[in-house]
Amino acid sequence: MPRPDLELIGVGYRKIPIMAIGKDVYCDSRLIISTLESLYPNNTLSPSTPANVGIRKLFESWTIDGGIFTNAVKMMPYWQEASFLSNEAFIDDRQKLMGRRFTAQGMQAGRPEGAQHLQQAFDLLETTFLADGRDWILNTQEPSLADIDAVWPFKWLMSDLKMKDSLPAEHFNAKKYPKLFAWVERFVTQLNEKKETLPKPNALDGKTMGKRIIDTTTAPETIPFDDDNSHGFKQGEGVEISPSDYGQTGKTAGTLIGLTVHEVVIRNSKGIHVHFPRWNFAISRAASKSKI
């Protein structure tokens, strides 16, 4: 749905979550996680060896770019009484976001294809990383970022109450995939136990948070600028940034102030520094205004 709280701080990006630290706003979960890992190195969940870091990065891309999430969406139980299909405003909004309209007929037609692709994903985890009976992907004592990056679409399908019966039981069950089902259950248990140890978050409304972000006097993070970039962008140029996979209409405009191979930062009209990953995001020069 439209994001008035994000519009309030000059961010046209539509996806959530985002993270704000002072006057810095970080978009996309992958960038948020890497930023938190850098800020709190003593509490990191990152793998300890270069090879395992590489495996974790591959999982980070696999669940999104590898089609796992796309095929999980095809399995949404559209037939339920409280299904998203009953909300016309939501359907209209998602059509703008994703470029296609969700219908019962279309959802039903897509289920066999979604199930077939997900069976491949279930098979992969069951017969490789989890095959030896380990608790976690990298055989760690606790879940690592590799587990977080790998598990979330499976957790959504298997434990979210709104996704109940999304997976046909004859193809997806604990007898056929005992190790994967046990892994997801372990992760959910660990997640719930960790939540119990944390203080209860203080929920604030969007206007309050927007004002806090805009009014903060904390100096924004400094990101270097790669002048020798492949696009020939110059520091200080006006640009627009948008996702390149879906949600391309959610553009965020501003002045280009930071650029590396992995990250781009703009200063928007509210004076906020908005950070995006380079992967799956497009940078375009802002249209020049004609002079009369």
Protein language model features and the residues they cover:
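GST-like domain detector, emphasizing the conserved glutathione-binding G-site
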Residues: 1-94, 104, 233, 240-243, ...
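Catalytic cores of secreted or luminal carbohydrate-active enzymes
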Residues: 169-226
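Solvent-exposed, charged interface segments at domain starts and junctions
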Residues: 1-13, 166-185, 189, 247, ...
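GST-like fold's C-terminal all-alpha helical module
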Residues: 66-182, 189
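Non-transmembrane alpha-helical segments in soluble domains
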Residues: 33, 37, 57-60, 122, ...
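Acidic, Ser/Thr-rich low-complexity intrinsically disordered segments
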Residues: 207-251, 255
